[in-house]
């Protein structure tokens, strides 16, 4: 420690040189100068960097990376030229191997620190994170905001971190390669036909967002333009409703792109940050595209809930099904089931499966997916898990051999956890998108009589800080016991020898 810096007060715009010794939960580099902590976006553990303080507090500060003086062995050149400005990827400067280690450590440390579990116990049951062979071009869905730059030029791209400022870009490296051609086609059409971009501040302008989806197994592509449309549509000569000026030109250009299967319009006139409205009109070919996940075929509409990384989702769900240990006779409850992907996948190995989801559209999709795949042993309920589960258990006496839960980031509701403990399933499979709330819920379940058996992270979103985790818990029966063989002769001899020596 440098005595000359003892008691120094750090302030905004100070330039400092620091070694990065840790990684924060949001992927930021962490360094310390005389006990004063600096959080630096885009810095990598092992870097020596020059930074400028942007926001100073008493014991810590947020700083901007000015220069990498000595790069870490884990630092790489990002594929994306706007990686620093864009808010989508936080870890592109870090090697993929180090990203996986960061996520493994993040899950482990949260369970130990926030859940109060013994580190050695967690280390003994943690399995290696499930990574991707190729961590790019994995997203089958992307939503691109449309706006204008300071010169009035129409742009599309991605929001900068913690803002709604659009960073222009059409070639996202974690999205499908078709995104670029589709977006450039739409921008060119808008410029030629003087179609306005939406302005969030004024609420004026027509085109708000572009949604692009692709079925990885089918190769089918969907484009949906979200527009601020307040008038009445008119019919073209072909009978198609028109919502855009010279709409036929746009359809002609987009339909020429290989794989194009569905073009639609979504109406959203609300002054809101919510991207999609509820009114969707198909203007070319099909309303949906198809994809396959876990051996099941799904029809996907613009509003459908569907995993954005089907490659990793299959691995994650396969692990969850393996943990469930199904033999063909079990009754399974799947809470927060979405469109029923896990529910339907487990139905093939269970006696009866029940899915619960609060969003009606998702349950409609789940029921349709069950019919489409010829599944007859699955039932779905609309409602809050913490309300539906107690009702079915207390009023109808429905039980569970296995309960699978995949809650939102806030974790599982305490009422649902309490009912799960009362139902006392043999196994609980917990799929989590937030290891902090996972740790909290695991503590409740373990205090209620369950034991952690396995923990396995899964990298669903490479280049970002997000990590999924699947956990297996088993019921500890009151009569569980440990068999210990004791050699009484040996014990007696040891007691005698101890008494003689004294």
Protein language model regions, located:
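Terminal RNA-binding accessory module
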Residues: 1-78, 82, 379, 387
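Rossmann-like S-adenosyl-L-methionine
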Residues: 2-17, 25, 231-502
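Short beta-strand elements
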Residues: 21, 137-149, 153-160, 212-216, ...
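Short, acidic/hydrophobic/Gly-rich beta-strand patch recurrent on exposed beta strands
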Residues: 29-34, 157-160, 224-226, 366
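Short, conserved phosphate/pyrophosphate- and ester-handling motifs at nucleotide-, phospho-/glycolipid
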Residues: 46, 175, 309
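Extended interfacial segments that mediate partner engagement and assembly in macromolecular machines
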Residues: 66-78, 84-197
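Short, solvent-exposed loop/turn elements at beta->coil junctions and helix N-caps
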Residues: 127-134, 200-201, 207-209, 213, ...
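Internal alpha/beta scaffold segment
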Residues: 166-208, 229-264
């Amino acid at each position: 420690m440098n005595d000359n810096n003892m008691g120094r007060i750090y302030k905004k715009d100070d330039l400092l040189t620091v070694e990065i010794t840790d990684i924060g939960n949001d992927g930021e580099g962490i360094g310390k100068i005389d006990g004063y902590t600096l959080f630096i976006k885009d810095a990598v553990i092992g870097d020596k960097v020059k930074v400028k303080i942007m926001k100073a507090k008493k014991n810590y500060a947020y700083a901007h990376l000015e220069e990498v003086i000595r790069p870490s062995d884990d630092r790489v050149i990002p594929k994306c030229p706007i990686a620093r400005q864009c808010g989508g990827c936080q870890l592109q400067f870090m090697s993929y191997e180090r990203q996986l280690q960061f996520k493994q450590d993040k899950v482990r440390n949260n369970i130990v620190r926030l859940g109060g579990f013994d580190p050695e116990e967690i280390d003994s049951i943690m399995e290696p994170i499930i990574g991707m062979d190729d961590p790019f071009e994995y997203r089958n869905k992307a939503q691109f905001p449309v706006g204008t730059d300071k010169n009035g030029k129409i742009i599309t791209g991605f929001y900068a971190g913690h803002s709604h400022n659009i960073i222009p870009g059409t070639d996202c490296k974690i999205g499908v390669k078709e995104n670029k051609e589709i977006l450039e086609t739409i921008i060119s059409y808008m410029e030629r036909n003087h179609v306005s971009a939406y302005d969030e501040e004024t609420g004026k302008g027509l085109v708000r967002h572009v949604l692009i989806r692709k079925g990885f197994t089918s190769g089918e592509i969907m484009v949906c333009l979200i527009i601020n449309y307040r008038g009445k549509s008119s019919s073209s000569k072909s009978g198609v409703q028109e919502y855009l000026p010279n709409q036929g030109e746009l359809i002609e250009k987009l339909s020429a792109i290989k794989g194009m299967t569905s073009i639609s319009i979504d109406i959203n006139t609300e002054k809101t940050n919510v991207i999609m409205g509820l009114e969707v009109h198909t203007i070319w070919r099909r309303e949906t595209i198809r994809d396959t996940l876990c051996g099941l075929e799904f029809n996907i509409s613009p509003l459908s809930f569907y995993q954005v990384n089907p490659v990793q989702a299959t691995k994650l769900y396969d692990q969850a099904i393996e943990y469930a240990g199904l033999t063909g006779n079990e009754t399974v409850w799947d809470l927060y089931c979405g469109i029923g992907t896990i529910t339907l996948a487990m139905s093939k190995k269970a006696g009866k499966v029940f899915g619960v989801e609060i969003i009606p559209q998702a349950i409609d999709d789940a029921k349709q997916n069950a019919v489409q795949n010829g599944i007859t042993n699955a039932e779905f309920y609309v409602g809050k898990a913490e309300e539906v589960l107690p009702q079915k258990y207390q009023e109808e006496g429905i039980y569970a051999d296995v309960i699978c839960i995949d809650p939102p980031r806030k974790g599982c509701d305490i009422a649902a956890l309490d009912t799960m403990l009362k139902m006392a399933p043999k196994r609980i499979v917990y799929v989590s998108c937030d290891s902090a709330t996972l740790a909290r819920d695991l503590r409740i379940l373990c205090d209620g009589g369950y034991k952690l058996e396995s923990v396995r992270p899964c990298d669903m979103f490479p280049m970002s800080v997000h990590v999924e985790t699947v956990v297996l818990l088993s019921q500890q029966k009151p009569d569980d016991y440990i068999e210990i063989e004791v050699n009484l002769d040996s014990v007696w001899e040891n007691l005698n020898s101890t008494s003689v020596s004294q």
